[in-house]
Swiss-Prot record:
GO BP term (any one): positive regulation of transcription by RNA polymerase II
Protein name listed in UniProt: Junction plakoglobin
Organism in which the protein naturally occurs: Xenopus laevis
Known role: Common junctional plaque protein. The membrane-associated plaques are architectural elements in an important strategic position to influence the arrangement and function of both the cytoskeleton and the cells within the tissue. The presence of plakoglobin in both the desmosomes and in the intermediate junctions suggests that it plays a central role in the structure and function of submembranous plaques.
ARM repeat placement: 128-167, 168-211, 212-251, 254-293, 294-337, 338-377, 379-416, 419-460, 466-506, 508-547, 570-609, 611-657
Membrane topology: Peripheral membrane protein
Assembly behavior: Homodimer.
Keyword field: Cell adhesion, Cell junction, Cytoplasm, Cytoskeleton, Membrane, Repeat
Family label: Belongs to the beta-catenin family.
GO cellular component, as recorded: adherens junction; catenin complex; cytoplasm; cytoskeleton; desmosome; nucleus
Gene name of the encoded protein: jup
């Protein structure tokens, strides 16, 4: 645009105004139409009209001469209306401001004025911010002096003023940057006996604690011991400010956890669990979790102050989700402490946690599941868990790996040596659910192993054990179970599977399916491998190490015991014999492990029923070790040895049979005439199967905090940067991320 155009613009605008004065909603409050040349227009030409229809449109245009009063009024108010839209506070009479405004809508002038209003507002905020900052900066030295005054009234007034300043951003920043006034606030809070002053000073620290700079200032000024002292205040508002400030410090200030512990903060916090404000309790329990995580001493302090009882009480009595979640996290941390576990269980923790397994909150359900999982190995004798067991069986249909891990592990432990729980789970379709779980997660040891352990328990020593044994077969579980013996070997899973197969073999109807699934060659292969490993360590004179927590001798015992029960079936017995196992079984008679002596003599007792096998046993030189075992203190071993000797001596000469008869009489029947009967039953006397005596491991890690004060903060709980980190294996909680 050149200079000539700029000069001509006012002239063009004036000309336009003279001819189209009333055609704009900006200049007029009346509705207008397109002007015509003669003031009216009638469509009469057929060529311009639609066929068979006629329309008449009237348009009226006023000139300046026709309505001079209106023109004068509009010219007078134009500038005022723009000014009123831009700066409404300068106008006294607002009556004409809405002449063009339809109700609920802005005029064009008002829309155009919005940026200027926003700019004006920003300028005002900036002026106020600067004023607040300057005021606070000038006032801080005097306020510091007043806070240190000896007159309680002066101190009270000063604390009230500082409290007001701490509520505004600019003045709050100035306060945080003054170590002198923060120290004065802490000192005043610690020594005042006036409740109002205590409320004001704790409120100030609470306001400062929302900023990293404020947290550091409080920490350096010795604020933590003072805040811990305020936890004994009878004033609810003081308690709330103190606990929330400590919570922020624990979350985001390095060194705060140690400072709270040294100030006996835990001893002050645990009694606060008796309060009845759910939101206050949620913050308190989260503080306990932050302090207890990875610190055994803190866990013991919580125990010593009645923490487990208070936490269980909260889980039992409240419905506030955030409180239940934070409380369950504390219990989860404590549930891996050997001292706290029994206390939680005795306080009714299993029942209280089970109450929330059907909650709509996934994070609460998962915490409860992990805690139940960790506690379950010391809760095998607990009563009142029927509903929990049924829910856990239902949870086996979940697709969540964590849920399945917890549900299977808890069921495994709660069914260990507890006949009532075994029967209840069996009657609740537990066997079928566990089989489906194994089919879906056979490649996940964290799930498959406890699931197999639970099935091992369900198939032994309770009134519905036979029902469970048959149920495995009827739900096509045998092939899936036998496949778990395939390489690569996960020894804890292999050990549990061998024990389950032994129990399944107690049911004669399962022998054929087990045979068809190829269980005998797999067991023999495992037996040979594990025995060779055990012999290798014995030859080198080194103590046999555990492989994933399992000794090879345990695999030897398990495989031999399972083959012992399978050998009751003639077809299986012949298959075992054909795999050239007798030399190995005879060698196992020399084992120093009593349980291996028992199962090896037991399987030889079964094999000796066949003449060919009995001759092979004799040819392998079994008589000598069997004669020694006749004098074993274990009646089961002595009984099996006697039975084998009796069977292999049937074809011997009279002198040999007489000598064996004397040995048998002296060793067996002198003590118990029923021993021979026991040999036929193949159940060792007073010696429960060892796998049944073991609880499934209950060691799982606690939560691992994320980096504090970062972008990883949990969106569901703004002041808490945590994510759950469940895992398997032995618990190692002493590695916190600072």
């Amino acid at each position: 645009m050149d200079l000539g155009d700029v000069v001509e613009m006012p002239m063009k605008v004036t000309e336009w105004q003279k001819t189209y004065t009333y055609d704009s909603g900006i200049n007029s409050g009346i509705n207008t139409s397109v002007p015509s040349l003669n003031g009216k227009m009638v469509i009469e030409d057929d060529s311009l009209a639609y066929p068979n229809s006629y329309t008449t449109v009237k348009t009226t245009t006023y000139t300046q001469q026709q309505n001079p009063d209106m023109e004068s009024h509009l010219n007078m108010t134009r500038a005022q209306r723009v000014r009123a839209a831009m700066y409404p506070e300068t106008v006294e009479d607002h009556s004409y401001l809405f002449s063009t405004q339809i109700e609920g809508q802005q005029t064009n002038v008002q829309k155009l004025a919005e940026p200027s209003q926003m700019l004006k507002s920003a300028i005002m905020h900036l002026i106020n911010y600067q004023d607040d900052a300057e005021l606070a900066t000038r006032a801080i030295p005097e306020l510091t002096k007043l806070l240190n005054d000896e007159d309680p009234m002066v101190v009270n007034k000063a604390s009230m003023i500082v409290n007001q300043l701490s509520k505004k951003e600019a003045s709050r920043k100035a306060l945080m940057q003054s170590p002198q006034i923060v120290a004065a606030i802490v000192r005043t809070m610690q020594h005042t006996s006036d409740m109002d002053t205590a409320r004001c000073t704790t409120s100030i620290l609470h306001n400062l604690s929302h900023h990293r700079e404020g947290l550091l200032s409080i920490f350096k000024s010795g604020g933590i011991p003072a805040l811990v002292r305020m936890l004994s205040s009878p004033v609810e508002s003081v308690l709330f400010y103190a606990i929330t400030t400590l919570h922020n410090l624990l979350l985001y200030q390095e060194g705060a956890k140690m400072a709270v512990r040294l100030a006996d903060g835990l001893q002050k916090m645990v009694p606060l669990l008796n309060k009845n404000n759910p939101k206050f309790l949620a913050i308190t329990t989260d503080c306990l979790q932050l302090l207890a995580y990875g610190n055994q001493e803190s866990k013991l302090i919580i125990l010593g102050n009645g923490g487990p009882q208070g936490l269980v009480q909260i889980m039992r009595n409240y419905n506030y989700e955030k409180l239940l979640w934070t409380t369950s996290r504390v219990l989860k941390v404590l549930s891996v402490c050997p001292s706290n576990k029994p206390a939680i269980v005795e306080a009714g923790g299993m029942q209280a946690l089970g109450k929330h397994l059907t909650s709509n909150s996934p994070r609460l359900v998962q915490n409860c599941l992990w805690t139940l999982r960790n506690l379950s190995d010391v809760a095998t004798k607990q009563e009142g868990l029927d509903n929990v067991l049924k829910i856990l069986v239902n949870q086996l249909s979940s697709d969540d790996v964590n849920v399945l891990t917890c549900a299977t592990g808890t069921l495994s432990n709660l069914t260990c040596n507890n006949g009532r729980n075994k029967t209840l789970v069996t009657q609740s379709n537990g066997v079928e659910s566990l089989i489906h779980t194994i089919l879906r997660a056979s490649d996940k040891d964290d799930i498959a192993e406890p699931a197999v352990c639970a099935m091992r328990h369900l198939t032994s020593r309770h009134q519905d054990a036979e029902v469970a044994q048959n149920s495995v077969r009827l739900h096509y579980g045998i092939p899936a179970i036998v496949k778990l013996l395939n390489p690569p070997y996960q020894w804890p899973l292999v050990k549990a599977t061998i024990g389950l197969i032994r129990n399944l073999a107690l049911c004669p109807a399962n022998h054929a399916p087990l045979y068809d699934a190829g269980v005998i060659p797999r067991l023999v292969q495992l037996l040979v491998k594990s025995h060779q490993d055990a012999q290798r360590h014995a030859a080198s004179g080194t103590q046999q190490p555990y492989t994933d927590g399992v000794k090879m001798e345990e695999i030897v015992e398990g495989c031999t015991g399972a083959l012992h029960i399978l050998a009751r079936d003639p077809v299986n017995r012949m298959d075992i014999y054909k795999l050239n196992t007798i030399p190995l079984f005879v060698q196992l008679l020399y084992s120093p492990v009593e349980n291996i002596q028992r199962v090896s003599s037991g399987v030889l007792c079964e094999l000796a029923q066949d003449k060919e096998a009995a001759d092979t046993i004799d040819a392998e030189g079994a008589s000598a070790p069997l004669m020694e075992l006749l004098h074993s203190r274990n009646e089961g071993i002595a009984t099996y040895a006697a039975a084998v000797l009796f069977r292999i001596s049937e074809d011997k000469n009279a002198d040999y049979r007489k000598r064996v008869s004397v040995e048998l009489t002296n060793a067996i029947f002198r003590q118990d005439p029923a021993a021979w009967e026991a040999a036929q039953s193949m159940i060792p006397l007073n010696d429960p199967y060892s796998d049944e005596m073991e609880n499934y491991r209950a060691m799982y890690p606690e939560d691992i905090p994320l980096e504090p004060m970062g972008g990883d903060m949990d969106v569901e709980y703004a002041m808490d940067g945590y994510s759950d980190h469940p895992g398997r294996g032995h618990y190692a909680d002493n590695h916190m991320m600072a």
